[in-house]
Amino acid sequence: MASVFGSDNKKVWVFITEPNWERPYEDKLEYVERIRFCKSQYSVRMDKFILLFNKIDRIGDTTEENAMQACSNEYEGLFNAFRNHSPLASLFGPKYLFKFVRFTTGTYGVPQPGIPAHYTPSRDNYPAALWNAIIESIKG
């Protein structure tokens, strides 16, 4: 892992978050700090970042803007680690240096005695959005 992290090759980093993560506030702050550390210590200038907001079905099929706000509220300070500090960013560039992807694998039924567990896959737009973000990050 150290050789991959330390290489000068372009990398696409995917950081996974989820709404209503049932962890203490301190654990969430520690997770944000680990992401910050990873970004500052291991990434190189040409690396790209994807912030995956998994289990989006927990808060409904919300807009990207609402999902970003929910993610920002859940993981205090996370977005600041990716803020675009370029002087021209406020006029022309993106506010943050990541692609935000809403994601869900689908829904899982609660197993009941005598009834097999049930799984309903998500709509195709969720994995397609992740795939497109990865491809754009590789090409861009």
Residue spans of the language-model regions?
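Short glycine-/polar-rich loops that comprise or flank the Walker A/P-loop
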Residues: 8-12, 44-48, 94-97
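Amphipathic helical hotspot of TIR/SEFIR-family domains
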Residues: 23-44
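Structural beta-sheet core signal
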Residues: 13-15, 51-53, 102
